[in-house]
Amino acid sequence: MTDEPNQDDPQGPEVEAAKPSLKQPPMYKVVLLNDDYTPMDFVVEVLQRFFNKDRSQATQIMLHVHTRGKGVCGVYSRDVAETKVSQVNDYAREHEHPLLCTMEEA
């Protein structure tokens, strides 16, 4: 008997299957920042248009942003969060408002 692998064995040495270690991708909060110039109605419109909030939810978030300085609009994957930030900032500029939207890791 030798310690060499059996050349006649078509399957070769027994190999244990590696278990993939998958983890969830990081999520990001999309945040609106308060300013003294953007009308409250415009902020509500943005929340309805880009974050699919109903009027009541949008008003609550807008008031939170107004009183606390910033508020979370939603939590998304990185690509979705980046897209929403870009859409909101572009839309605000088109309408000549200084509203600023950012993202931060959740």
UniProtKB/Swiss-Prot annotation:
Sequence segments annotated as region (Disordered): 1-22
SUPFAM superfamilies for the chain: ClpS-like
Coiled-coil segments: none
Family matches, as Pfam families: ClpS (PF02617)
UniProt xrefs under PANTHER family: ATP-DEPENDENT CLP PROTEASE ADAPTER PROTEIN CLPS, ATP-DEPENDENT CLP PROTEASE ADAPTER PROTEIN CLPS1, CHLOROPLASTIC
Subunit (UniProt): Binds to the N-terminal domain of the chaperone ClpA.
Similarity-based family: Belongs to the ClpS family.
Protein name, per record: ATP-dependent Clp protease adapter protein ClpS
Organism, as annotated: Halorhodospira halophila (strain DSM 244 / SL1) (Ectothiorhodospira halophila (strain DSM 244 / SL1))
Taxonomic classification: Bacteria, Pseudomonadati, Pseudomonadota, Gammaproteobacteria, Chromatiales
